[in-house]
Amino acid sequence: DHAAFCARLNRGSLVAWGHAGRGADLGPTLPALTDIVSVCPSGYAFAARRADGRVVAWGRTADGGVVPAPIAELTDIVTVTGNGYAFVAIRRDGSLVAWGGGRHGADLPAPIAALKDVVAVIGNLSSFAALRSNGSVVAWGDPAAGGTVPDPIAALTDIRELTGNHMAF
């Protein structure tokens, strides 16, 4: 986060500090949770995965600080990843859900929304890239920041790890 910090404690609870509107304000209900297993930032929000596979978020709404109701009801989230403006979560079946800044990765293109074999996701400032179980990669979000995979890379099926920087993968 660009203006706040968050820490997950041994007991599965959270503490946060910094700019209140950018993720430091946990609100009235989040401090009582004791089942947080992971937490990640977007630019101005945080998302946390709970032990039961649900996800919660807080911070700036436009950057993913509110989980849409259909996603908040899910109980099969296995990982959550943020970029500068959005979050994406992998579900147990290898599919994806996303929320936050739409043009920066929260709007999943139909072919990517239909996938059921995603094993890892990484984000940069305004795009996401996902590794599939067949060793291929897909990306979406801002094309100028790696949100479109070049054809020679899209044809690869032996990718084992993804990494990115601020504006590229």
Locate the predicted segments by residue:
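Short loop/turn segments that connect beta-strands within the blades of beta-propeller domains
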Residues: 1-2, 10, 42-43, 51, ...
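Tandem repeat domain/solenoid detector
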Residues: 11-13, 35-38, 51-54, 75-79, ...
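Short, exposed beta-strand/loop patches in secreted or surface proteins that constitute
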Residues: 6-7, 30, 37-38, 47-48, ...
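Short, intrinsically disordered, charge-balanced linker/junction segments flanking boundaries
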Residues: 159-169
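Short polar catalytic/cofactor-binding loops
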Residues: 2-4, 21
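Short glycine/serine- and acidic-residue-enriched loop/turn motifs that recur at repeat junctions
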Residues: 15-32, 56-73, 99-114, 138-155
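Conserved core positions of repeat-based scaffolds
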Residues: 4-7, 16, 45-48, 57, ...
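Functionally constrained cores in energy, signaling, and assembly domains
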Residues: 8-9, 26-29, 49, 66, ...
